[in-house]
């Protein structure tokens, strides 16, 4: 696997230990963002209680006649957030997509609101101020707008990886600078942040990630002047290379 070749630049034995690769990854960021933006009560409750949504997805598809593992179910769990439907899927899988909108009525209602906004104003706007233009959007005979997949997808992806992840990067970088650390940010992939950790700074860097995680609500609220009533979670993994990172307890 390619990730195994990514190791710390501080890989000598000068200090009796080697540098580490740390990956700080948001837990179910898009689902949490969808819960926040839609204020769906069921989704908010599941986020708050740590409900295992992937196992639930597997259960729905399996009960519809297609035995499915939790890992296999992951491909479907959040797909409706991005505009995916049951079209072109097996009958059992399609059952889950219908079930999703029945279960998360607040998200379904929010999707409709976004569609109406796009038709009436030619654009949609999210709480950060980010806007997406749809100048040629029209209402189909079915009542749904054209470009509906993008209309449903952009707010979730935009607020999650376009608005939240960048400010977290800034907060991590600011704290690294304040402590005058050699450790540095080296990469981001979707909703995860990768750092190269100096061998003498592991405790400091883990402390920074914990501090950012503990203050995520305030960080987002201060940047975008919104009320964040859905918990966000930044989890850390660390190891000798990017592939072999382990959860930080």
Which residue ranges define each predicted feature?
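Conserved catalytic core of nucleotide polymerization and phosphodiester-bond processing enzymes
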Residues: 1-249
